[in-house]
Amino acid sequence: MMRQTITIPYGAVTDISPDIKLVLSNAGHILGSATCHFHIGNGEHNFVYTGDIKYGKSMLLESANTNYPRVETLLIESTYGAKEDIQPDRQEVESTFVASVNSVLKEGGKVLIPIPAV
């Protein structure tokens, strides 16, 4: 499988067929996440597909790059895309998390922090 895999850096124009070009951009979501910008024909139609994106810079990642010259079609898959999905303030979440961990440790408890693999 690795012999059939190629890496494409962000910003590189890649011909995937005679009339379709692909440019990947940072999605800011997780390491290696990308938006896919397809130029179809001679730029007559531009299609962008992405999964989750993040506009705010994090401690690890830059924010998503959405500087496209032109887009006619946009398709976004998202975990938190509904109106009621309000993300809490990062500092508030971190403070609550640290306080909870410190409270458990102060009482002699153990803290297990499971991290899902993506």
Residue ranges and their predicted role:
Residues 1-116:
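His/Asp/Glu-rich metal-coordinating catalytic cores
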